[in-house]
Amino acid sequence: MVKKVAVIGAGVSGLISLKGCVDEGLEPTCFERTEDIGGLWRFKENVEDGRASIYHSVITNTSKEMSCFSDFPMPEDFPNFLHNSKLLEYFRIFAKKFDLLKYIQFQTTVISVKKRPDFASSGQWDVYVQSNGKEQRAVFDAVMVCSGHHIQPHLPLKSFPGIERFQGQYFHSRQYKHPVGYEGKRILVVGIGNSAADIASELSKRAAQVFVSTRHGSWVLSRISEDGYPWDMVFHTRFSSMLRNVLPRTVVKWMMERQMNRWFNHENYGLVPQNKYLMKEPVLNDDLPSRLLYGAIKVKTRVKELTETAVVFEDGTVEEDVDVIVFATGYTFSFPFLEDSLVKVEDNKVSLYKAMFPPHLEKPTLACIGLIQPLGSIFPTVELQARWATRVFKGVCRLPSETTMMADIAERNEKRIDLFGKSQSQILQTNYIDYLDELALEIGAKPDFISLLFKDPKLAVKLYFGPCNSYQYRLVGPGQWEGARNAILTQKQRILKPLKTRTLQTSASAPVSFLIKVLGLLAIVLAFFFKLHGF
């Protein structure tokens, strides 16, 4: 019987895995190589090998109501999008509330994780760690790998002919911390992900000129959406997810293109994606379009070659006197403490069942938590992963046969490539609500909307037409939280609380759309019923 669980890493995934273990009556021990919690979200001035690194100005791309853990809302006075220091504060409050620090061994590095000789029957692991220069071994019944995938920089220098003769400075974006020191420079940022857009926008306020080189372009989205609400609270609803799943793909793409171009015309700004029919994650940036409009940033095509001081682009244009190149080219992931056969990556495909479990193990006692990139917040995602993993360890939830898991992995990879493409940056991409529901279904935590419609129509409407946040997965099933319903119904006031810092006299108005939403939900139920019974 599984009792002792090793948790590798005390970042977001590690903290929620600790809580998942405690909730299920397991005995976790977390090994953290640094001196503190927070992982990626704990800013440090220096870059450390083996540790994720962020720049000082990083702000979350997902809002607080969509990012909090399911039974622990963020304080209502917290801003809707958090600076990294504020998010770290939330993690500290969370860890203190659930008394998680006592399970963590800091400044302890995991050297290797190996199957025990009797693994086929016991499912146990030998975990070798190093602390204070001494190596130790401990036996664990299960292992949760929570070390993240933003550690190993992807720096494809061979794809940039002439880089060896370039006389300027170049580095991966993980080395970037502040814009200070780049005054008057001509800077090229390679890439168009979130980090690339952030760094380019920030540098453009000090540099003489910033260029952004992109192979494929990208949609750019503001954090502010309809009526000033956070983008993800408008985009990630069950109703909109249902439409994206049932409407013809061409219609969905047309709707998405119209939505993305509402802020500004991407073609006019040189940003329109090369393949508009892939569901690539949009860049979240509130400054980039205005910096382009000011001329502080210029979008360029792919780099063809470099000279001592210039950059030649594929369209034949040349930019002279380039001082700095920042490669915002993403990350590869590796787990040097694991055997290569445990987490296989071949042809940009990850062989993990539901992005978590190696399918070939005789006993399902190892799970990767956080090795996923949802089109939404990572925090509720890793929480559900941890909740499912701990129940699998206990034997309450069971995995299917290896054959079934391999077939699911193959099908999932095919769908991912069809939706998101084959590029290295999309290897971990997945749809958000669909994946959350998959995991919730495994543990019995997915709400029954048909039943709720008759028992609690007000809540049912909120669940279906409102934002799909983590509270929904505490309404029923194991780990049910009595505060979940109230958290769902009061989320609007927590959104508005940090914004309403100036007292105004406003007239109260009833939610006139409530009846329309109820009727719409009834229509959906009836349509489903008639389809099910062949009417």
From Swiss-Prot:
Role played: Catalyzes the oxidative metabolism of numerous xenobiotics, including mainly therapeutic drugs and insecticides that contain a soft nucleophile, most commonly nitrogen and sulfur and participates to their bioactivation.
GO cellular component: endoplasmic reticulum membrane; membrane
Parts of the chain that traverse the membrane: 510-530
Any one GO MF annotation of this record: monooxygenase activity
Protein's gene: Fmo2
Listed Pfam families: FMO-like
Required cofactor names: FAD; Mg(2+)
SUPFAM superfamilies cross-referenced by the UniProt entry: FAD/NAD(P)-binding domain
UniProt xrefs under InterPro entries: FAD/NAD-bd_sf, Flavin_mOase, Flavin_mOase-like, Flavin_mOase_2, FMO-like
Record family assignment: Belongs to the FMO family.
Cited PANTHER family: DIMETHYLANILINE MONOOXYGENASE
Protein EC: 1.14.13.-
Cross-link (Glycyl lysine isopeptide (Lys-Gly) (interchain with G-Cter in SUMO)): 492
Residues annotated as binding FAD: 9-13, 32, 40-41, 61-62
Gene Ontology biological process terms, A to Z: energy homeostasis; NADP metabolic process; negative regulation of fatty acid oxidation; organic acid metabolic process; oxygen metabolic process; toxin metabolic process; xenobiotic metabolic process
Source organism, top-level taxon: Eukaryota
Record-given protein name: Dimethylaniline monooxygenase [N-oxide-forming] 2
Membrane topology qualifier: Single-pass membrane protein
Keywords from the named record: Endoplasmic reticulum, FAD, Flavoprotein, Isopeptide bond, Magnesium, Membrane, Microsome, Monooxygenase, NADP, Oxidoreductase, Transmembrane, Transmembrane helix, Ubl conjugation
Subcellular location: Microsome membrane; Endoplasmic reticulum membrane
Residue sites binding NADP(+) per the record: 60-61, 195-198
Main location: membrane
